């Protein structure tokens, strides 16, 4: 009998999330325990999600049942930079549903979060995973696990046929696919197959629960929300990125050193990423715009600062596939270290299935708007066009980024 792709519970436990939510949560506990934030859900495909509201609400209510077990806490205790006070807090943590609002507005599903950053930060990944899987249960209920497995092995065959043994030995790939996965069981199977059969170097997953299950190190550092929040936390807007990086450095003392560049734009980021930060951080993460142009720009920045790019790593995570990863790898190989975090194309690539394009983004911090502009016009996110205009003015951001792939 074929194995079902759907488990009874969509979100398995509190660790069924991306690792960077925990690393940011610790930094919030230590630095911003009283900051209030707002988040909003957006579906980028024109898809009617209203029929799924009741089931989404049911699954969301089950989040409130989750808490960390002694074994799960003991796994986190082995991660040296997670501090005892944070782990004690996590041991007591429960999802508080009073901060979450769902319903229908203007003919569309809405999901909003409003509350203390410390208490809403963990909602994002499980909420997106719930929306994705609930929708897939309705639309693709006949799907079986074998379809996902076969599709993954077809990708391995392509990679083996198109990359040399030497290239494969250096091609580092990680799973970043929790939030838009087809289902938990599909992600579990994909990560298990990657660990045992990937022809390149599988370096791990961002999913903390699956890292624990497969005895691997969870991967991740920071997300856009960390830099976005500082737009309303720092003394001056122009200093907001520096404030975000400074706070991260104080929290982690050189650990977790991959910085995200495109919250405003990479040009604006590199203007703040001076010799101090460039020496201290291990590398940079790409999440929008032309990846090879971005890589060239980062290499040039390190050279300008007198830093050997081969001592640094670039992590790519923007809508990647294995062919796209191989193309980027070949373009930059031997000049800087590269690694690839692949999400939807691993955990929601099944023949006949259309993956969702959904996000849940911070829209306000302490009652004031925050924004992500990014290196790609379609990825700008802000409720307040006046604030976006002000942000562009302060950081001298042109209408089209120098890294936009849509030029």
UniProtKB/Swiss-Prot annotation:
Enzyme class: ligase
Gene Ontology biological process: NAD biosynthetic process via the salvage pathway
Signal peptide from the UniProt entry: none
Pathway involvement of the protein, from the record: Cofactor biosynthesis; NAD(+) biosynthesis; nicotinate D-ribonucleotide from nicotinate: step 1/1
Post-translational modification: Transiently phosphorylated on a His residue during the reaction cycle. Phosphorylation strongly increases the affinity for substrates and increases the rate of nicotinate D-ribonucleotide production. Dephosphorylation regenerates the low-affinity form of the enzyme, leading to product release.
Its EC number(s): 6.3.4.21
Catalytic activity: nicotinate + 5-phospho-alpha-D-ribose 1-diphosphate + ATP + H2O = nicotinate beta-D-ribonucleotide + ADP + phosphate + diphosphate
Gene Ontology cellular-component terms listed: cytosol
Listed GO MF terms: nicotinate phosphoribosyltransferase activity
Membrane-spanning intervals of the chain: none
Purpose of the protein: Catalyzes the synthesis of beta-nicotinate D-ribonucleotide from nicotinate and 5-phospho-D-ribose 1-phosphate at the expense of ATP.
Similarity comment: family membership: Belongs to the NAPRTase family.
Protein name as it appears in the record: Nicotinate phosphoribosyltransferase
Natural source organism: Pseudomonas fluorescens (strain Pf0-1)
